[in-house]
């Protein structure tokens, strides 16, 4: 999602002040490259610039906001995830205090906006509502009238995030469920009736090759409701895979 948003902003005339998003296995290399990008961005800011930051930005967020304000620039923060809500790496007051350094917040939806306001966020807040999904691939998916409906579920697979999948087969009779993702810790899930596991496939390959009718957005432990911290977070989050399913 962050890479897509970076490309969309550039297409709208924005300038990347730092370094383009790259991925390295070495944490040391990644740390120094991120630091170089942040220093570069800070030096290039001019008065009246609007700096868009994709949040969370780990340890550098507050520092960048302060540098931007020292240079008389405005900061717009696009929220991807709230660490205090899902991963619990921050307390809620800590996160609200951190976000108070920005001038404007783009929340994912009205529920996230309301949650931020109810917990003391006083910044102006707008909403994104749904992610754009960039891909040059053409979907080939078509439903065959003679076959059962096919549903796909994409994402990291583990008992903490999607235990509900273990209980799903007993309710499946009119459709098949295809699982895509890495970290399959749901042992034996692919041996259950009406379920197939296809491992990790890059999103562009999935769009070009998958044959399915619907995509499932659901997290948690229960089939009756999205429960647990992951399931509860869906009330406030717009999963990027929703846009992926639409793109397929």
Language-model features, listed with the residues they occupy:
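A short, glycine/small-residue-rich beta-strand->loop->alpha-helix junction that serves as a flexible
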Residues: 1, 27, 53, 159-161
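Histidine-centered beta-alpha loop that forms part of the nucleotide-sugar donor binding/catalytic region
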Residues: 55-56, 79-83, 128-132, 180-182, ...
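Conserved catalytic-core segment of nucleotide-activated headgroup transferases in glycan assembly
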Residues: 134-208
């Amino acid at each position: 999602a962050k890479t897509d948003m970076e490309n969309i902003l550039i297409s709208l005339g924005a300038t990347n002040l730092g370094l383009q998003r790259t991925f390295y296995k070495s944490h040391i290399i990644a740390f120094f490259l991120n630091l170089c990008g942040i220093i570069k961005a800070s030096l290039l800011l001019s008065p009246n610039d609007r700096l868009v930051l994709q949040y969370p930005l780990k340890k550098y967020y507050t520092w960048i906001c302060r540098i931007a304000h020292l240079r008389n620039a405005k900061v717009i923060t696009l929220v991807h995830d709230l660490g205090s809500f899902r991963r619990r790496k921050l307390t809620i007051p800590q996160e609200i205090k951190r976000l108070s350094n920005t001038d404007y917040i783009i929340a994912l939806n009205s529920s996230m906006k309301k949650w931020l306001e109810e917990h003391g966020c006083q910044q102006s807040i707008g909403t994104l509502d749904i992610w754009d999904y960039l891909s040059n691939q053409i979907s080939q998916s078509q439903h065959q009238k003679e076959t059962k409906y096919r549903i796909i579920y994409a994402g990291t697979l583990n008992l903490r995030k999607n235990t509900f999948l273990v209980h799903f087969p007993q309710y499946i009779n009119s459709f098949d469920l295809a699982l895509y993702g890495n970290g399959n810790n749901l042992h034996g899930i692919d041996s259950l009736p009406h379920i197939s596991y296809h491992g990790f496939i890059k999103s562009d390959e999935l769009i070009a090759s998958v044959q399915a009718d619907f995509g499932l957005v659901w997290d948690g432990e229960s089939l009756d409701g999205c429960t647990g911290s992951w399931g509860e977070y869906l009330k406030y989050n717009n999963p990027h895979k929703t846009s992926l399913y639409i793109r397929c």
